[in-house]
Amino acid sequence: NRFLLSPVLAGEMTVQDIILNDWDWYRDNNITLHTGKKIVKIDRKARKVFADDGTEAEYDRLLLATGSNPFILPVPGKDLPGVIAYRDIADTDAMIEAAATRKHAVVIGAGLLGLEAANGLALRGMQVTVVHLAPWIMERQLDKPSADMLQASLEKKGLAFLLEKQTESLIAGADGRVSAVRFKS
């Protein structure tokens, strides 16, 4: 349940808490669940799907749940170790691991997901700076006075903000991991 990733990141829930249905539920409801498979072909006449690993599955009804991919800034350094998107439980686990071994985090983007990630990392003891291109946080959802109130509340929790900053690149440290953000001037 992707909507509940933030409480997992914040340490308020566990992965087990957010699983909608366990494996037994699928079996008990006559549902064959194939996880981690990449479908490469659908034969609608034969009512079959084919996965890249050779798995074939027949169907009566087919639901395509393709998911989505997170937006990653197209800047140099975006592929460095330590640059983590926030979309699924693997990303959440990577952030939890980083919070256990690192002290500082920079979250690029002050939309809802960015602020939830920043809050979760702060609750795990990190010093967090939120970088945002717009003049105020959540500019698509909030007017400036509301955004200012929210920002002040988050600053009281220890978050720092750099607004109207455009990321130019992500810089590697001596260990090869991301260690700094360079902004356009």
Positions of PLM-derived features:
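Short clusters of hydrophobic/aromatic residues that line enzyme substrate/ligand-binding pockets
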Residues: 5, 9, 73-75, 83, ...
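FAD-binding core/adjacent interface of flavoenzyme oxidoreductases
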Residues: 21-106, 164, 180-185
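A Rossmann-like FAD-binding core segment of flavoenzymes
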Residues: 33-50, 57, 123-185
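Hydrophobic/small residue at the entry helix of a nucleotide-binding pocket
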Residues: 113
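Hydrolases whose catalytic domains are alpha/beta-hydrolase-1, hotdog thioesterase
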Residues: 116-117
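Beta1-alpha1 glycine-rich phosphate/pyrophosphate-binding loop at the start
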Residues: 1-32, 120-145
